[in-house]
């Protein structure tokens, strides 16, 4: 079972923790990790915009986002991250420590880490579905969620382009899973990395053959969420497609569009 353990990483992880200090890593280290993951996931999609070969994988072929709108979006996202997300991490630091989150906790086994990631995706998706659906009603949409829909044809960095209150509301769903299943910072950072890739990818505007959408059943991905931005309603879940199917909120023409695309590919 040693092969299913992360013990081989522990010495390097604990040296890293000793060097920077647990106090720094829990708050500021997590923020830095967030920034590295977020922009690290976005940059490949940004590069793809400059390579003609990838143009055929764009979902909304007729819509372009100019540099002015992308720059404005990037500035607003960074301001939200620095002025909202970082203070949130600092404010909740005592609560995080109170529940026992530690950078020095033993690392989980690989199976338990995978279980935590899958469970966190399911929990976050369920929370996001209902919170997101609620944000499409009345004053919640008019004064809060409408900001996120400024871009009908999204690109990766728009994932966190949102009203500050929405950032707080939807951010809660991201941390529930890892806090329920683990108390170690390593797992939280791994989850943060995969979750940020998921949200950046589903806002990327690209449907590549190697995208999770085409590999994992019930995975929504960019085509699923891009449709939501295009028509402003339906397809509310963040990661999977089954909740929208169960509760009857799948986009009316989404699946007919997917079926048509599959037929065109087979011809």
From Swiss-Prot:
Keyword terms of this UniProt record: Endoplasmic reticulum, Iron, Lipid biosynthesis, Lipid metabolism, Membrane, NAD, Oxidoreductase, Steroid biosynthesis, Steroid metabolism, Sterol biosynthesis, Sterol metabolism, Transmembrane, Transmembrane helix
Motif placement: Histidine box-2: 145-149
Entry EC number(s): 1.14.18.9
GO cellular component: endoplasmic reticulum membrane
Chain ranges passing through the membrane: 31-51, 72-92, 110-130
Its membrane topology: Multi-pass membrane protein
Reactions that this protein is recorded to catalyse: 4,4-dimethyl-5alpha-cholest-7-en-3beta-ol + 6 Fe(II)-[cytochrome b5] + 3 O2 + 5 H(+) = 4alpha-carboxy-4beta-methyl-5alpha-cholest-7-ene-3beta-ol + 6 Fe(III)-[cytochrome b5] + 4 H2O
Enzyme class: oxidoreductase
Protein's cellular compartments: Endoplasmic reticulum membrane
Pathway this chain belongs to: Steroid biosynthesis; zymosterol biosynthesis; zymosterol from lanosterol: step 3/6
Principal cellular location given in the protein's record: endoplasmic reticulum
Residue ranges annotated as motif Histidine box-3: 224-230
Gene Ontology terms: biological process: sterol biosynthetic process
Domain Fatty acid hydroxylase span(s) in chain numbering: 119-249
MF-aspect GO terms: C-4 methylsterol oxidase activity; iron ion binding
Motif Histidine box-1: chain residues: 132-136
Listed cofactors: Fe cation
PANTHER family in alphabetical order: STEROL DESATURASE
Domain remarks in the Swiss-Prot or TrEMBL record: The histidine box domains may contain the active site and/or be involved in metal ion binding.
Family classification: Belongs to the sterol desaturase family.
Protein name, entry field: Putative methylsterol monooxygenase DDB_G0270946
Annotated organism of origin: Dictyostelium discoideum
Organism ancestry: Eukaryota, Amoebozoa, Evosea, Eumycetozoa, Dictyostelia
């Amino acid at each position: 079972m040693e092969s299913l353990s992360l013990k081989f990483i522990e010495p390097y992880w604990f040296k890293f923790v000793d060097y920077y200090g647990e106090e720094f890593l829990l708050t500021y280290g997590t923020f830095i990790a967030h920034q590295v993951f977020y922009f690290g996931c976005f940059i490949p999609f940004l590069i793809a915009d400059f390579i003609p070969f990838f143009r055929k994988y764009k979902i909304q072929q007729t819509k372009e986002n100019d540099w002015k709108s992308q720059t404005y979006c990037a500035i607003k996202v960074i301001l939200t991250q620095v002025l909202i997300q970082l203070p949130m991490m600092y404010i909740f630091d005592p609560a995080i420590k109170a529940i026992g989150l530690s950078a020095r906790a033993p690392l989980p086994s690989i199976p338990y880490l995978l279980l935590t990631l899958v469970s966190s995706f399911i929990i976050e998706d369920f929370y996001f579905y209902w919170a997101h659906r609620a944000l499409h009603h009345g004053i919640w949409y008019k004064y809060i969620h409408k900001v996120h829909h400024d871009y009908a044809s999204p690109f990766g960095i728009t994932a966190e382009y949102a009203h500050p209150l929405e950032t707080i509301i939807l951010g809660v769903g991201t941390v529930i899973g890892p806090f329920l299943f683990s108390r170690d910072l390593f797992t939280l950072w791994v989850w943060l990395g995969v979750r940020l890739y998921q949200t950046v990818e589903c806002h990327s505007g690209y449907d590549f053959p190697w995208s999770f959408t085409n590999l994992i059943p019930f995975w929504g991905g960019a085509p699923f969420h891009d449709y939501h931005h295009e028509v402003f309603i339906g397809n509310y879940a963040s990661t999977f497609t089954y909740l929208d199917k169960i509760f009857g909120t799948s986009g009316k023409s989404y699946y007919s569009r997917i079926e048509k695309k599959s037929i065109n590919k087979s011809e």
